[in-house]
Amino acid sequence: MALSLLKRQGYRIIDQNVRLRSGEIDIIARDQDTLCFIEVKTRASAAQGSAVESISLFKQRKLVKLALTYLKYKKLLEEKARFDVVAVDCQDSGETYIKLIKNAFDLNDSGLMRYR
């Protein structure tokens, strides 16, 4: 579902489920000239809260560290990069909502995601 949405939006998928020593990056893709590190969050029920709400400050910081590790390893530190989120919320009614949030947070943020 997330990959289909990203492709429809013009992203070029580079890699997915990238495992590093300290964690995993869900999707790495290019959106024009920008390298995007994409976190995919799904909530199976509204009782669990929204997918967006589940991305804590701790998770954001972890994603930043993972991305920096990846960029160093691939010698891409000069690349333009950003963090996007694909949020998938399944409602109790059976409906599913999927949302792409570009540039959700960055290295300099105080910890609050832009779309909250």
Task: Go through the PLM ranges and name each one.
Residues 43-69:
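Mg2+/Mn2+-dependent nuclease catalytic core
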Residues 27-47, 63:
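Conserved catalytic cores of phosphodiester-cleaving nucleases, focusing on short active-site segments
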Residues 73-116:
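Domain-level recognition of nuclease-like catalytic cores that cleave nucleotide substrates
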Residues 24-26, 39, 59, 84:
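Acidic active-site catalytic centers that drive phospho-/nucleotidyl reactions
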Residues 24, 33, 96-97:
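Conserved catalytic motifs of the protein kinase core domain
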Residues 1-16:
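Acidic-basic catalytic patches of nuclease active cores, encompassing PD-(D/E)XK
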